[in-house]
């Protein structure tokens, strides 16, 4: 199990990203627009830099819904390989069976 504080911090970051998404997208569009004057683009860059860092999408870490483990994460199932194996062996994940040939 992951530390509760790490899981909660990630949830807080997801919330912050959702709140800041439109503002960040607008500022990034201004920064990337080559037809605008360099002064306006620079001001937009400064505003973007002044926003909270946790509002950036790259700060989010995919974590297992069951254990909170940050590595070996399967996106489709939203769980780690260890949780998948345990739940799959106990028959709690539909469509997952132990292979044999």
Curated annotation (Swiss-Prot):
Record-level GO BP terms: translation
Pfam families named among the record's database cross-references: Ribosomal_S14
UniProt GO MF annotations: rRNA binding; structural constituent of ribosome
UniProt cross-references to Gene3D superfamilies, sorted A to Z: 1.10.287.1480
InterPro entries registered for this protein in UniProt: Ribosomal_uS14, Ribosomal_uS14_bac/plastid, Ribosomal_uS14_CS
Record keywords, A-Z: Ribonucleoprotein, Ribosomal protein, RNA-binding, rRNA-binding
Annotated stretches, region: Disordered: 1-21
Gene Ontology terms: cellular component: cytoplasm; small ribosomal subunit
Role this protein plays: Binds 16S rRNA, required for the assembly of 30S particles and may also be responsible for determining the conformation of the 16S rRNA at the A site.
Family to which this protein belongs: Belongs to the universal ribosomal protein uS14 family.
Subunit field text: Part of the 30S ribosomal subunit. Contacts proteins S3 and S10.
Name of the protein in its database record: Small ribosomal subunit protein uS14
Originating organism: Agrobacterium fabrum (strain C58 / ATCC 33970)
Lineage start: Bacteria, Pseudomonadati, Pseudomonadota, Alphaproteobacteria, Hyphomicrobiales
Gene: rpsN
